[in-house]
Amino acid sequence: MSLLIDFIDETEEVKEEYMSLIREVLEKAAQMENIEDGAEVSVTFVDNERIREINRDYRDKDQPTDVISFAMEEMGEGEMEIVGAEMPRMLGDLIISIPRAKEQAEEYGHSFDRELGFLALHGFLHLLGYDHMTEEDEKEMFGRQKEILEAFGLGR
C-alpha cells in the first residue's frame, strides 16, 4: 500500500517523527478503506492565525479550528470529471493547526502524538466522504475513526 503524502510545515516546528506518525496512520487508514496505490494527499501544518484565516475565508467561521479538509473529489454543479488513466487519484488537502493540536492534547489528557494522529485521520476520512452532520453519519464516521485508531495502536 502506497499513499503519496506531501507535507508542508508552515510552522517550522513539526519533527520528522510526527510526519512519520501521520504517514503511518494515513497508510493504515488507506489500507483499511481500500484506497488504491498511488493516491495523493497533502498535509499542511499551520498556526492558529493561519487556520483561522482559512476557516473564515472558506467556511465563514472566524475562529481557529484543529483541522480543515479540502476534498478534491467533491464535484460541484456543472463540473466535469477529468478522466486520465495515468493520473494519480488526488484525494485532497489536510490543514492541521499545531498549536490547537497541542491545546487539545492537554485538554483531553492524552499525548500530542495521539491528537495529531487523530486529527490527521479525522481530516482524511472527510476527504473520503465521511461526515458528521447527522447523528447517523457521525456514528458511522466516529466508529470508523475509533476502529482505525485502535488498529494502529492509538486508541484511548
From Swiss-Prot:
InterPro entries, per the entry: MetalPrtase_cat_dom_sf_prd (IPR023091), YbeY (IPR002036), YbeY_CS (IPR020549)
Cofactor: Zn(2+)
GO molecular function: metalloendopeptidase activity; RNA endonuclease activity; zinc ion binding
GO cellular component, one term: cytoplasm
UniProt keyword rRNA processing present: yes
Entry note: cofactor: Binds 1 zinc ion.
EC primary class: hydrolase
Predominant location category: cytoplasm
Entry binding sites for Zn(2+): H122, H126, H132
Localization terms from the record: Cytoplasm
One annotated GO biological process: rRNA processing
UniProt similarity note: Belongs to the endoribonuclease YbeY family.
Function recorded in the entry: Single strand-specific metallo-endoribonuclease involved in late-stage 70S ribosome quality control and in maturation of the 3' terminus of the 16S rRNA.
Family matches, as NCBIfam families: rRNA maturation RNase YbeY
Name under which the protein is recorded: Endoribonuclease YbeY
Organism of derivation: Bacillus cereus (strain ATCC 14579 / DSM 31 / CCUG 7414 / JCM 2152 / NBRC 15305 / NCIMB 9373 / NCTC 2599 / NRRL B-3711)
